């Protein structure tokens, strides 16, 4: 059998194939266009949202609750945002850590089991996690290190799907087995992410390769920093801030795209590895998990074009240029401002901002922090004025998270993977909830708005396109 030397074909090197693909692409773009007015005519809830942008009710959950309004005399009044995990306010969960160093493991327990653990229960759970927090040298060598690339989310999906083959009961979707799989994946995902990044650095950037095992007795946040850094050192505040960031990103209701993906895929009866890989694929999308990267890129642009970061008028003038599509990426967006649910404040942003300030003080980066605060204050007002909005606009958690990760020395390639590490406990809790309350497969309706046509036999079809002959080109390339 004659096989190609290339996994993917470079169209620029094959003229006739490139021409044929351009013809096919043009045909595609000339079809599949649906009249936007039809969505209004048939009252289609695009994005599963109503005309006001609120998500339509598609399910019930006890895992988390997101609130942004108070009901006063039957009217919804914007309020400070609140977030509850299994009924507990996120502010209380964070403030309750004053006597403890880290809280992400306790948050995982709470999300999975619906109750706060006792000291004995938490220690037992940490021991279980520690037993799972390992990858064999064979897996690291044969899976993680193969086909490394800059997209760590892609590598994580591949590794998760490959772990299926190492599981003696991969297709068992009983709640008991899925719990075991979930805890194991929660424990292994930080290793997969960090090792995939080191593999990328070594094989794609020709940098020194080092793989460090996690240390038993350390928190997930501590082990991430230990495995990531060449010298394996970190300060207590650095580990604490990362731990808080993981807690704040762990869960946010059943309707966000990646968690809803968990529900949709789980309802089909598929395995845990496929479900987690699908949710990672959702989170990878720039409309979902990549927002903090956009915020960082935007601030890099602001720092370049604004000479005096403390000059409110100069900063405001440049933000107006961004909103008018005259600067940065010409999208007209101030990234990190606004949220689909929150109005007056995003509680995650409020908490993370407090810890970002502490970290900026330790790192000597208060000048940058002050710029973030200024853009946050000005951006809220400018967006409301520009969009003529009556709903308040607040900064969301993505506004400060990228800045925090940068101060922690976490590379941009790991920003979204860190989000995945934080969110997999939430996905796991929702998968278990879907299984334990097994209903029907999720299948919303789509209305056909095309036209029925009479079949035309081949000789009578209109030859609307002429495809170039590729035989000659294939002969030249030996394919």
Explain the meaning of each model-derived region.
Residues 4-479:
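Non-transmembrane, aqueous-exposed alpha-helical and coiled segments at domain scale
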